[in-house]
UniProtKB/Swiss-Prot annotation:
Sorted UniProt keywords: Riboflavin biosynthesis, Transferase
Catalytic activity annotation: (2S)-2-hydroxy-3-oxobutyl phosphate + 5-amino-6-(D-ribitylamino)uracil = 6,7-dimethyl-8-(1-D-ribityl)lumazine + phosphate + 2 H2O + H(+)
Coiled coil (UniProt feature): none
Biological-process GO terms, alphabetical: riboflavin biosynthetic process
Protein name: 6,7-dimethyl-8-ribityllumazine synthase
Organism lineage string: Bacteria, Bacillati, Cyanobacteriota, Cyanophyceae, Synechococcales
Gene: ribH
Function of the protein: Catalyzes the formation of 6,7-dimethyl-8-ribityllumazine by condensation of 5-amino-6-(D-ribitylamino)uracil with 3,4-dihydroxy-2-butanone 4-phosphate. This is the penultimate step in the biosynthesis of riboflavin.
GO CC terms, sorted: cytosol; riboflavin synthase complex
Tree of life domain: Bacteria
Entries under Pfam families matching the protein: DMRL_synthase (PF00885)
Organism: Prochlorococcus marinus (strain MIT 9515)
């Protein structure tokens, strides 16, 4: 019996794309920072001249799937990370954005056979979002670890 697992030891052999929603950038900037810190500590070149990391900014979480799809058409990535923050308001807009963003990201991942980490915070309040973006824990770090694991796993399986 073969057992396959992703590795957490290094990201230096991965090509990573990050798509970040600008809406709620107080939150998304913090998540991106945590994500980049983790990737750097695991050996990925995160400098502005990096050839193994690309970052794309989009207006909001709804636009994450199309940007991810365009990135995957452009280049061979081992893994993508989508980052956003959608905070519940008084209308149903929250539900629509989350539903379409999550379905879109999943569909792009399936269509291109590339893992895309769904790093979109969905919270009921700004306080909850801030807690997840660094006050208590920066989930950006976790999303990067998931990317390292899935990127290496899929490389090993192929």
């Amino acid at each position: 019996m073969a057992i396959f697992e992703g590795s957490f030891t290094t990201a230096s052999n991965l090509k990573v794309g990050i798509v970040v929603a600008r809406f709620n950038d107080l939150i998304t900037n913090k998540i991106l920072s945590g994500c980049l810190d983790c990737l750097k500590r695991h050996g990925l070149d995160t400098s502005e001249t990096s050839e193994t990391l690309d970052i794309v900014w989009v207006p909001g979480s709804f636009e994450l799937p199309i940007a991810a799809k365009t990135l995957l058409k452009k280049s061979n990535y081992d893994v993508l990370i989508s980052l956003g923050a959608v905070i519940r308001g008084e209308t149903s807009h929250y539900d629509v954005v989350i539903s379409e963003a999550s379905k879109g990201i999943a569909q792009v991942s399936y269509d291109y056979d590339v893992p895309i980490i769904f790093g979109v915070l969905t919270t009921d309040s700004m306080q909850q979002a801030l807690e997840r973006a660094g006050i208590k824990n920066n989930l950006g770090w976790n999303y990067a670890l998931q990317a390292i694991e899935m990127g290496s796993l899929i490389k090993n399986l192929n």
